[in-house]
């Protein structure tokens, strides 16, 4: 017998064989009922077939319950060890030549058993249950749905849909790639970034910067075409000028544009070179470009007004800790440079990276003399500080006022404004 035979096929073959009457026998050939005369022996034979030596009737009966839902075998109520073939009512009267094809058809699935009954018998004449046509109908519908799904998967519509969903985005990248090499065949990343910043849609410019910005990093002397591009940037400072505040990333690019226009001094170019860290930060271009376009879109200043404070703003931030008089009375006039520099600083701390140390490194800005006043600052908050003899000898240089006000710029990083008073330190 085939080793892949199922349990109901195994019982059916035992019933067909003549020498197994002492273990299993028919009780009603017309109704398809049979009885397990020796249930443990039948279970042992089934265990030998499946290479399970510990098979018993309890496990066999649980296996037979699986066929209850499949409408193949049913337990006859009120009679012990008596079962009934529901889908094979005339299987007892069939001959040996007609019966073997039935189990072979149903090896794959129990539901596929029903079409085999169509050839063996017209239906259940005893009970009148049309189980065979119902099973055949279910098999036909399942096969129909399965074939339609396979046809859909093989038709190419599924794969074509997913590929076409990605189609609209790639044409955005070859378009600027074809336009940018025309203006600058082997240009620096500055002209591509300038053309992206002048585009009306900043989101599209950010997407173009991710794909088309990196492959064009070839540093060569550009031809006369970048002159026209830099002139367009000088005519449109509203969108073309977000790059100069971002000196940390856009330093090398602006240096090339400044030298092409010719309206800047070499000192300003050197100042931008000192501030810019390296060209390796070009990977952060999309996030910075989006942030600048959202914040500095309304800024309209000339190129000279933006570059000149860039030259002098860095030393002023460094000179602020070295001048004690600034802490005394020049809080609002921290940068006595030009009105444009104060206007740029008024836009917010996120405009220029040079202002970030002002807010994040507050203890560095609170060092006006050789003795660090940060220690003195925190000692005033301590209840033990007035009793310390080391702190009685030092006081803030004041211009006759009883209180020393720290400038608002230097304490923006703190949560609350702090006023230092040398009064509690006097004995």
UniProtKB/Swiss-Prot annotation:
Classification via Pfam families: Ets
Name of the molecule in the record: ETS domain-containing protein Elk-1
Matching SUPFAM superfamilies: Winged helix' DNA-binding domain
Residues with Phosphoserine modification: 323, 382, 388, 421
SMART domains recorded: ETS
Similarity comment: Belongs to the ETS family.
Cellular component per GO, a single term: nucleus
Swiss-Prot/TrEMBL keywords: DNA-binding, Glycoprotein, Isopeptide bond, Nucleus, Phosphoprotein, Transcription, Transcription regulation, Ubl conjugation
PROSITE patterns: ETS_DOMAIN_1, ETS_DOMAIN_2, ETS_DOMAIN_3
A GO biological-process term: cellular response to testosterone stimulus
Protein location: Nucleus
Lineage summary: Eukaryota, Metazoa, Chordata, Craniata, Vertebrata
MF (Gene Ontology): chromatin binding; DNA-binding transcription activator activity, RNA polymerase II-specific; DNA-binding transcription factor activity; DNA-binding transcription factor activity, RNA polymerase II-specific; double-stranded DNA binding; mediator complex binding; RNA polymerase II cis-regulatory region sequence-specific DNA binding; RNA polymerase II-specific DNA-binding transcription factor binding
Species annotation: Rattus norvegicus (Rat)
Region feature (Disordered): 116-146, 166-202, 226-252, 300-350
């Amino acid at each position: 017998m085939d080793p892949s035979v199922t349990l109901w096929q195994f019982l059916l073959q035992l019933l067909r064989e003549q020498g197994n009457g002492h273990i299993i026998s028919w009780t009603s050939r017309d109704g398809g009922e049979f009885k397990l005369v020796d249930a443990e022996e039948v279970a042992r034979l089934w265990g030998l077939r499946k290479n399970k030596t510990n098979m018993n009737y309890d496990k066999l009966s649980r296996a037979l319950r699986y066929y209850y839902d499949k409408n193949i075998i049913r337990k006859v109520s009120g009679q012990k060890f008596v079962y009934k073939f529901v889908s094979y009512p005339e299987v007892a009267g069939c001959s040996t030549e007609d019966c073997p094809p039935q189990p072979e058809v149903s090896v794959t699935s129990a539901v596929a058993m029903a079409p085999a009954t169509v050839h063996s018998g017209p239906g259940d004449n005893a009970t009148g249950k049309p189980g065979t046509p119902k099973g055949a109908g279910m098999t036909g519908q399942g096969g129909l749905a399965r074939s339609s799904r396979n046809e859909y998967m093989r038709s190419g519509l599924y794969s074509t849909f997913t590929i076409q969903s990605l189609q609209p985005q790639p044409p955005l990248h070859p378009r600027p790639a074809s336009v940018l090499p025309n203006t600058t065949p082997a240009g620096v990343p500055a002209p591509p970034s300038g053309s992206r910043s002048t585009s009306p849609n900043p989101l599209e410019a950010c997407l173009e910067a991710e794909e088309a910005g990196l492959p064009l990093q070839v540093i060569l002397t550009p031809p006369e075409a970048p002159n026209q591009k830099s002139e367009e940037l000088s005519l449109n400072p509203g969108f073309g000028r977000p790059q100069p505040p971002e000196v940390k990333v856009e330093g090398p690019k602006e240096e090339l544009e400044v030298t092409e226009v010719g309206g800047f001094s070499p000192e300003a170019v050197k100042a931008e070179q000192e501030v810019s860290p390296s060209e390796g930060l070009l990977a952060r271009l999309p996030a910075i470009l989006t942030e600048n376009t959202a914040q500095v879109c309304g800024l309209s200043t000339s190129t000279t007004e933006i570059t000149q404070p860039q030259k002098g703003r860095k030393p002023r931030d460094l000179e602020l800790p070295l001048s004690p008089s600034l802490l005394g009375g020049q809080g609002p006039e921290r940068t006595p440079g030009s009105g444009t520099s104060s206007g740029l600083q008024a836009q917010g701390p996120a405009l220029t990276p040079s202002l970030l140390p002002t807010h994040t490194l507050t203890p560095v800005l609170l060092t006006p003399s050789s003795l660090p006043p940060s220690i003195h600052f925190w000692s005033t908050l301590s209840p033990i500080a007035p009793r310390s003899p080391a702190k009685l000898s030092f006081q803030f240089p004041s211009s006759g006022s009883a209180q020393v006000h720290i400038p608002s710029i230097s304490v923006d990083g703190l949560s609350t404004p702090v006023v230092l008073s040398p009064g509690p330190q006097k004995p």
